[in-house]
């Protein structure tokens, strides 16, 4: 099974999460990583992509640039580019829904194999998951 998690808020990394770096970089990231790592231990799960928003902000460091930035055995972190390079707090993501959907669909189009399931974390990610279902028919679950 290939699971794609979408979590757009905060400064997500696979290791050494900078908790508190921004107001949006908190416990929800810890729970997401624990879920991904526990799922990776399941022999039926062969791949997990964590998709988040990429940005360039010298105050926050260079590691948040768009692209595939980190990889583990089964878990990969992918940062999509929505055309706005600045870090955006969660309250401002709603202004980028169209661009984020376009970037997420482009990421999915570029995959040889589509995810079996998308797990969207919070409302903004739910909008992307719904769009992926419309375009590709990929089922999704939503937690907020």
PLM regions: where:
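N-terminal hydrophobic or amphipathic segments with adjacent small-residue motifs
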Residues: 20-21, 123
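A cross-family glycoside hydrolase active-site/sugar-binding cleft signature
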Residues: 51, 121, 141-143
């Amino acid at each position: 099974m290939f699971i794609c998690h979408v979590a757009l808020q905060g400064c997500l990394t696979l290791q050494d999460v900078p908790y508190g770096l921004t107001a949006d970089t908190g416990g929800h990231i810890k729970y997401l990583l624990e879920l991904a790592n526990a799922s990776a231990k399941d022999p039926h799960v062969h791949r997990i992509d964590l998709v988040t928003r990429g940005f360039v902000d010298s105050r926050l460091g260079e590691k948040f640039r768009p692209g595939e930035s980190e990889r583990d055995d089964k878990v990969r972190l992918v940062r999509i580019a929505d055309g706005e390079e600045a870090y955006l707090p969660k309250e401002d993501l709603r202004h980028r829904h169209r661009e984020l959907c376009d970037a997420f669909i482009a990421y999915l189009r570029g995959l040889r194999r589509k995810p079996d399931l998308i797990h969207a974390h919070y409302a903004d990610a739910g909008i992307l998951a719904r769009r992926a279902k419309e375009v590709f028919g990929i089922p999704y679950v939503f937690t907020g």
